[in-house]
């Protein structure tokens, strides 16, 4: 049987309250790196992180963005180097190996989201790539407001460029273009998407 993302998310939510209190919890500050441990996975209870690597010349490559309910950890990747950076204050539960089989749904979500982001990164032109990345962020970290969909996670232009394999200057120019066209609004360093006004 194939389950939809919404079904899986609901399943995670229904089990989260019974599972999480049994596990040790840790709190990390913004920009702190979650320790590289191969013997645990981390379930995010609050906050947001990004997973990333970097090339030989030091260029950062963002691999994913993760929020509450997501399961993250070094055992989930074979990429080297690999780092989990906190974008906000983050609270996680420490999930030991003998409980990983209880988190199959969360692991499925992890795979689905990684593939979604990978497909976005290869979209052309770059304007479509950026717009679909913003839509993806709004679905994961957004909420409905009167003007549209507010992305509550503050992602810098440089961080967007690192995800989308482009330059910060290009991201800044395209965001200004989207704003001029009425497709997005700025609100206290956050972005509001006006999804109905943009045609893919």
PLM regions with names:
Residues 42, 84, 183-184:
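A structural signal for short hydrophobic beta-strand segments in well-ordered beta-sheet cores
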Residues 61-116:
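Cyclic-nucleotide recognition modules
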Residues 141-200:
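Phosphate-/nucleic-acid-contacting segments
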